[in-house]
């Protein structure tokens, strides 16, 4: 499987501009099986989603409007899955930081069917995210073209128990808006999650700046041995890599770390 990790600048609150940027970059890496966009790729991350145009859940379910509709159109056009997170307003008045995993040909008469998503569990209290967003409570794994992907968003990366692999996924996706000031931690944590879980890790981060932070990128694919391949810092980039499941499974058989992990209750007690 070929994956394309899209490192892009995000225009603050300008969905149309961000769609144009993402589309141009994605088309430069045609023939991939999966495209992954950064956290809140359509607006940029804002701790108060009321000041940005959130995707309304009811509309997303019924009509798949822009930008979710655009993700579906690109999935159809490229015959590939497209993943990326955005702020979503639910009917109960709460907001979620929702990572959508959109597969091709999932709409019938304009209605989105069989949608898959993950709501960010660990909200970034340091940045005020807990004041307006509601955390998700479920771990989500999606299978696409024979590869099992665990979904996560940004701050989730710091919590290894939440991302513990029980041999139920092959690759971890982490979409982020991770600031330059903590870039060393980002790179180390991506490698740590790959090594301890014997999996591929797809870490997708943005570049540029917003009213709160500067972002240098660091979009990286880490293989199960902990070897990283990264985009250049501060540059728009599409990192394309192949996930080799045969090699992954052979490694797990020969070096069965997942079979010998402590049970979570034992760790906690």
Predicted region positions:
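Active-site catalytic loop in hydrolytic enzyme cores
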Residues: 59, 63, 89-166, 182-188, ...
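Extreme N-terminal starter segment of soluble prokaryotic enzymes
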Residues: 1-5
């Amino acid at each position: 499987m070929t994956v394309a990790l899209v490192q892009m600048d995000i225009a603050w609150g300008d969905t149309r501009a961000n769609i144009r940027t993402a589309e141009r970059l994605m088309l430069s890496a045609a023939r991939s099986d999966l495209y992954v966009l950064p956290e809140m790729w359509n607006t940029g991350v804002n701790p108060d989603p009321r000041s940005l145009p959130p995707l309304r859940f009811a509309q997303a379910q019924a009509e798949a409007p822009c930008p979710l509709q655009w993700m579906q159109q690109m999935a159809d056009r490229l015959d590939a899955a497209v993943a990326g997170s955005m702020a979503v307003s639910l009917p109960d008045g709460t907001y979620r930081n929702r990572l959508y995993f959109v597969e091709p040909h999932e709409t019938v008469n304009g209605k989105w069917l069989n949608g898959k998503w993950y709501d960010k569990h660990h909200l970034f209290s340091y940045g005020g995210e807990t004041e307006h967003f509601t955390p998700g409570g479920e771990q989500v794994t999606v299978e696409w073209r024979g590869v099992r992907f665990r979904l996560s968003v940004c701050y989730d990366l710091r919590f290894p128990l939440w991302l513990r692999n029980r041999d139920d996924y092959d690759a971890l996706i982490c979409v982020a808006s991770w600031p330059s000031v903590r870039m060393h931690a980002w790179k180390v944590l991506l490698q740590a999650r790959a090594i301890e879980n014997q999996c591929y890790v797809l870490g997708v981060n943005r570049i540029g700046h917003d009213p709160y932070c500067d972002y240098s990128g660091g979009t990286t694919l880490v293989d199960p041995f902990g070897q990283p391949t990264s985009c250049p810092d501060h540059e728009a980039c599409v990192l394309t890599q192949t996930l080799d499941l045969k090699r992954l499974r052979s490694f797990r058989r020969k070096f069965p770390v997942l079979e010998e992990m402590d049970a979570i209750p034992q760790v906690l007690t």
